[in-house]
A protein has these predicted regions:
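Gly/Ser/Thr/Pro-rich low-complexity, intrinsically disordered segments
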Residues: 1-405
Length: 405
């Protein structure tokens, strides 16, 4: 009785988190309704609605990615103009010989600098130490570096990011970096895709009947990196991923219906290869090519959107874009209390993304749907024990980052 009705700040905080966590699920609402009176639940949900209403209208500035000297309305940045590619043949004039032909040493040095320019997150000292221990890594040049120790049976590399994160994988050709994200009670992976022009939403070929695993969808579309996109209808927890929840767009083709709840958001990928956050009930932009809807928005125009109600420790999936236009895919594992892996809040996800210069980001469907796949294998574990190592639940669609051609 005390825990149900008291206004003690500590108890009230965790009671609110418990109620909202239960009520935001499709099959576990009974965890709240079974023993908590309706009037208490209604009060919590009313306050929840007020907080969600406060996010309505918080949308991305249409010019957020334009350079200071770019005229308004110009469709930039296009990927070819604004993404730094690894090119070992680029040389500076001051580094060339008298006949303007760069030496082999100069080419090697420039290729090295190109690599560190693209993968700016890497701690150079630990990277050089790794290369000294594994010289074959450079056998095909800096632009062909491929390191993958992200699998379930791998321990990761000895390389660190400048933020102290463990590096799990580097794919220089495809422009992909995987980092181990961890903290008190949570563990996950942040994937960084350096070229936003290679991202799209791809649909399950069996949409309407059943879903497919994110890796299956990715492999069908030349993907090297993938994560879940939209949620799906899950009556009694028995959904098979075939019934799309909300609206999505895949390569210019629209599917589903917009969420009618005012608190939902849509993340749109436009022809300029930039993400934009919009209200789900706002018109879809004419130059939108791909989109997904969920809630809440995490970051809009580089500013964290504080959320006082999605504060439970849960498995999370988030997608965003940095000020360098990199695609950020974050998946946090959870629901393994005996291992100390519970999950985290959306606010903490925002902090992780902001550290990587995120400008726009949204929370996606979490739980057992939250999965990250890289180059033929899943690199995060599902929160559902039976599906832990098998790719999680089937999905209606996935964000797919494609291989370099």
């Amino acid at each position: 009785f005390f825990c149900v009705y008291t206004n003690n700040s500590f108890v009230k905080k965790w009671r609110t988190i418990y109620i909202n966590t239960a009520m935001d699920t499709m099959r576990h609402q009974w965890l709240a309704t079974y023993f908590i009176p309706k009037d208490v639940i209604d009060e919590v949900r009313y306050e929840y609605g007020l907080v969600r209403a406060a996010t309505v209208g918080k949308e991305s500035n249409a010019n957020w990615g334009k350079k200071d000297d770019t005229p308004a309305g110009t469709d930039t940045p296009a990927a070819d103009d604004n993404v730094t590619y690894i090119n070992p043949n680029i040389t500076h004039e001051s580094e060339q010989t008298e006949d303007n032909t760069p030496t082999a040493e100069e080419l090697e040095k420039q290729a090295q600098e190109n690599f560190y320019s693209v993968f700016w997150e890497l701690d150079r000292t630990s990277m050089e130490a790794y290369l000294a221990e594994h010289p074959d890594t450079l056998a095909n040049g800096w632009d062909q570096i491929y390191i993958n120790e992200a699998g379930f049976d791998d321990e990761g590399t000895s390389i660190q990011s400048i933020f102290g994160e463990q590096v799990l994988a580097i794919d220089a050709k495809d422009g992909v970096l995987l980092l181990r994200i961890s903290g008190k009670g949570y563990r996950g992976v942040l994937a960084v895709g350096k070229d936003p022009s290679r991202l799209s939403i791809e649909m399950a070929t069996t949409l309407g009947t059943a879903g497919q695993l994110s890796g299956t969808i990715a492999e069908a579309h030349n993907g090297v990196l993938a994560m879940n996109a939209n949620g799906f209808l899950d009556p009694n927890g028995a959904g098979n991923g075939g019934l799309l929840a909300g609206y999505t767009m895949s390569n210019g083709t629209a599917y589903g219906d917009h969420f009618s709840a005012y608190a939902y958001k849509r993340i749109e990928l436009h022809e300029d290869n930039l993400f934009y956050i919009k209200d789900a009930l706002s018109p879809v932009s004419e130059d939108c090519t791909d989109a997904a809807e969920f809630t809440p928005a995490l970051i809009v125009d580089g500013k964290k959107i504080m959320d006082d109600y999605w504060t439970g420790e849960q498995p999370r999936a988030c997608i965003g874009q940095s000020e360098n236009y990199e695609i950020l895919m974050l998946v946090i594992e959870g629901r393994y209390p005996l291992e100390g892996i519970l999950g985290t809040s959306v606010n903490n996800c925002s902090e992780i993304l902001l550290q990587h210069k995120c400008m726009q980001a949204i929370n996606l469907d979490g739980g057992s749907s939250a999965m990250l796949w890289f180059d033929g294998e899943y690199v995060t574990q599902s929160s559902s024990s039976p599906l832990r190592y098998t790719g999680g639940r089937p999905l209606p669609n996935a964000w797919v980052y494609k291989k370099a051609e």
